[in-house]
């Protein structure tokens, strides 16, 4: 064993520079693979959805509401909480969520957990610690920090062979978070990987309270402990440097800081217990919230798993994610995210036995269709689950100017709903007012005629959703009568002192020649003969009216 003080050790693919208790490491980089797996367990921590009116200024929006959070397979954590509060013991809870299973004992095992994978990471120990290379050579490190980062290796130094294992009589910190067990460090692609190797029961102490609040009922915590233990043993991986990710790609692992007395007690009370199906450890998937019913493996992943079938989950209603939404998405951004060839015109879904979406077809304005799985859309839009219902709302035109006394036909789509209403806000008003119910055709289309007298904004109203903004500007009717000694006319509606301009066309532009204002009767005039050219009269009355123009006239 070598005592490391103030010098450099060449460690194969790495180089450690220690100055007193402070060390830095330079990894030359290996080509070890760093793969990724699909997320299985889902943490319960997030922000609750607001129940207030949700508004979007986009002309077309996608409003999605749903139930639950997570993949829906296996044990519902909020459901376990609910069952425990209704007097169920943990074994009964587990038997309910994992159909046809029993409990049994597993062999004592160790687990390798990836706790860091970054270009730079810092290890620290408050007491003397050791580093051992792949050949078994060992060196003692003084208490302190060790910064590990990728960089070209320093040559011509005493060598140790990677990977390197760090051990201490106290938990070692990785980027400020303490972990039990031994830490193995290696280069993987462009990153430094830190893998924590420790006993299964010690690992669970950092998992159970990270996946489920430690102040939940004891029986729920016991069910979580058995599920997490089972999932771990069913997913030990060969052929790579670690078994599990230390986050929700597998299970959230918070290390020493996450540990709690109540979670530890639940782990100890169920020590070694696992969920078995026909004598084998079950892949005991779990997730946050079902929304009232769990999913089947067949509808979620395409392959049947006998113990992962839909079951009722009536007691997860305490979860803030039992129901969620509506969440609004700008339809133009959704079309871009889904790589559609034309603007989005709606979504059509096919539901599985549990109500979750199996497939969703995106409809485009050019009549093309693209089909996705429910999971693909969930990932693309960041939805909480695949149990959702989309509503497409669009109001056209987004903007238009009309002449007072005329009418505008508003058209649009309301797919996924039977009824939708129109709201209006006139210039000068601060509140929106109901403007009538719209009749939605079977294909989702609707149309309605509006006759605003002033500039008015319209939008669609469905439940708490307000979307599809259309701005209709209203211009005055300007009448101009040219004569040999000038031009005169009137403005309707009558607005006294409204600004009036005489304009002449110059190429593609219009030049203002003279200005005046309307009298008390809404009349105006410009005196003086006009030279040959094309003219028009512009009136900008304000008071909620847009500028209006007369018909252009030719003077020869």
Please annotate each region the language model reported:
Residues 436-442, 514-521:
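Short, acidic Ser/Thr/Gly-rich low-complexity loop/linker segments typical of extracellular
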Residues 2-485, 493-494, 501, 529, ...:
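Conserved, single-site charged/polar hotspot
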Residues 458, 535-537:
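Hydrophobic beta-strand segments within extracellular beta-sandwich modules
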């Amino acid at each position: 064993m070598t005592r490391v003080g103030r010098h450099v050790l060449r460690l194969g693919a790495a180089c450690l520079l220690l100055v007193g208790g402070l060390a830095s490491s330079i990894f030359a980089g290996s080509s070890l693979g760093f793969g990724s797996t699909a997320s299985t367990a889902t943490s319960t921590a997030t922000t609750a959805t607001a129940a207030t009116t949700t508004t979007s200024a986009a002309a077309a929006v996608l409003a999605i509401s749903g139930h639950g959070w997570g993949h829906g397979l296996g044990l519902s954590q909020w459901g376990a909480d609910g069952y425990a509060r209704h007097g169920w013991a943990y074994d009964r809870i587990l038997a309910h969520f994992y159909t046809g299973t029993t409990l049994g004992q597993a062999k004592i095992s160790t687990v390798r957990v990836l706790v860091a994978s970054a270009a730079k990471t810092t290890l620290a120990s408050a007491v003397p610690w050791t580093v051992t290379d792949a050949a078994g050579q060992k060196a003692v490190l003084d208490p302190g920090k060790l910064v590990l980062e990728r960089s070209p290796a320093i040559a011509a130094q005493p060598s140790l062979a990677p990977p390197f294992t760090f051990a201490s009589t106290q938990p070692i910190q990785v980027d400020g978070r303490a972990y039990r067990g031994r830490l193995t460090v290696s280069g993987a692609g462009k990153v430094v990987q830190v893998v924590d190797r420790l006993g299964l029961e010690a690992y669970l102490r950092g998992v159970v309270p990270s996946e489920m609040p430690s102040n939940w009922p004891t029986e729920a915590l016991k069910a979580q402990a058995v599920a997490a233990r089972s999932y771990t043993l069913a997913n030990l991986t060969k052929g790579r440097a670690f078994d599990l990710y230390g986050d929700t790609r597998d299970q959230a692992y918070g290390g020493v800081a996450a540990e709690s007395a109540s979670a530890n007690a639940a782990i100890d009370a169920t020590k070694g217990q696992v969920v078995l199906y026909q004598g084998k450890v079950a892949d005991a998937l779990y997730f946050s919230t079902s929304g009232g019913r769990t999913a089947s493996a067949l509808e979620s992943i395409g392959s049947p798993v006998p113990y992962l079938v839909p079951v009722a989950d009536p007691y997860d209603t305490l979860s803030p994610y039992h129901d969620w939404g509506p969440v609004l998405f700008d339809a133009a951004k959704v079309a871009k995210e889904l790589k559609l060839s034309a603007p989005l015109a709606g979504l059509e879904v096919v539901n599985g036995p549990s109500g979750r979406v199996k497939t969703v077809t995106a409809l485009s304005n050019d009549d093309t269709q693209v089909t996705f799985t429910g999971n693909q859309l969930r990932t693309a839009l960041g939805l909480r689950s695949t149990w959702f219902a989309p509503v497409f709302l669009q109001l056209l035109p987004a903007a238009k100017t009309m002449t007072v006394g005329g009418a505008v036909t508003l058209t649009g789509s309301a797919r996924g709903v039977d009824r939708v209403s129109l709201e209006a806000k006139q210039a000068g008003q601060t509140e929106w007012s109901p403007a009538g119910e719209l009749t939605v055709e079977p294909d989702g289309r609707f149309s309605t005629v509006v006759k605003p007298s002033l500039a008015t904004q319209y939008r669609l109203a469905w439940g708490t959703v307000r979307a599809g903004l259309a701005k209709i500007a209203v211009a005055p009717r300007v009448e101009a009568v040219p004569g040999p000694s000038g031009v005169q006319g009137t403005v309707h509606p009558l607005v006294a002192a409204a600004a009036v301009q005489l304009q002449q066309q110059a190429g593609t532009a219009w030049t203002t020649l003279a200005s005046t204002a309307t009298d008390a009767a809404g009349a105006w005039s410009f005196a003086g003969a006009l030279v040959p050219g094309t003219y028009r009269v512009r009136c900008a009355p304000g008071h909620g009216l847009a500028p209006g123009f007369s018909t252009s006239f030719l003077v020869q």
